[in-house]
Amino acid sequence: MNFSARSTLIRLLNGDLLVHSPSPIDDELIQQIAAIGRVEHIVAPGNYHYFYVSDWQRAYPDATTWICPGVERKRTDLHFDWLLGNRSPASWEGEIDQVLLRGTRFIWEVAFFHRASRTLVLTDLIENIGDATQGADDVLLKLWWKAVFRMWNRPKPAPEYQLGWSDKAAARECLERILAWNFERVVIAHGDCIEQDAHARLREAWASPLTS
């Protein structure tokens, strides 16, 4: 099944680059990044988005590694510098806001809001896979997302979220904090980014924890 993931590069005001949800890296990508700046922050924003952190650490040994709580339990061998939380660290305070999502059973994630571009950056809180998605002709992908998960052309949280919320009140508080941000677009790890009606589409996708 062709299920790809997107990495996001954010340039901070001082010129440092932050890589969010590291993807596979090779010499060609390293050269492309070098034309933009230097990676100083490696961010594993969720407990399913850490697989290539070690590769990026080898490519950028002086970078600081930040991980979502829970990753350290899944990868006890992974070196990291700091755990992410609800407060932005000094490295990007005033530029990027963040929320550690609580109230979930199987999946953990930190949401980020880049103020200057008014962009919300998520991993699994929204997946937007459908007819326009690259790789949409994959038969297994379409079977699972359309027939099983009923998420085809319908942005929703990842199936791991839908399996159950441990504390919907806590989750609702976190989601409302995210919706209070003044974002215009949503960059996500899986599927097509949301460029229009972002607030309304997210509120609809999160209807279950928001209204329960």
Positions of PLM-derived features:
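Active-site HxH/HxHxD metal-binding segment of metal-dependent hydrolases
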Residues: 32-92
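Active-site neighborhood of phospho(di)ester-bond hydrolases with catalytic His/Asp-centered motifs
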Residues: 19-21, 40-47, 66-68, 121-123, ...
